[in-house]
Amino acid sequence: MPAPLTLDGFRADLAEFLYQQPDEVDLEENPLYAGLDSLRIVTLIERWRETGADVSFIELAECTSFDQWWQLLSARQGGAGHVTA
């Protein structure tokens, strides 16, 4: 069973695609305004599915902040994603 996605891992994944440090990722920022295009979002979705978070592109596209993404992802892991380590 894959390790669940953590908030730290989520921030690190976003930072990689945004060319930032994980602590620079603003979770209140709109993903589309942050510069994530559809290809990058699909790549992230595939990565997160490997951790057990089953979300779709449409579900993420309806969210208006990275924090909403995190809430959806962590809920899809049965709450296991609330770990920060």
Curated annotation (Swiss-Prot):
* Swiss-Prot/TrEMBL keywords: Fatty acid metabolism, Lipid metabolism, Phosphopantetheine, Phosphoprotein
The cofactors required by this protein are: pantetheine 4'-phosphate
Q: Sorted alphabetically, which SUPFAM superfamilies does this protein's record hold?
A: ACP-like
Q: Does the keyword Ribosomal protein apply?
A: no
Q: Which residues carry this modification: O-(pantetheine 4'-phosphoryl)serine?
A: 38
Q: In which pathway does it act?
A: Lipid metabolism; fatty acid metabolism
Q: Can you name this protein?
A: Acyl carrier protein ScoB
**Which organism is this protein's natural source?**
Streptomyces coeruleorubidus
Name the job this protein performs.
Acyl-carrier protein (ACP) involved in the biosynthesis of a unique class of isonitrile lipopeptides (INLPs). Is the dedicated ACP for the loading of activated acyl groups catalyzed by ScoC.
Q: Which residues form the Carrier domain?
A: 1-77
The UniProt gene name for this protein comes to scoB
Q: Which domain of life is it from?
A: Bacteria
Q: Does the keyword DNA repair apply?
A: no
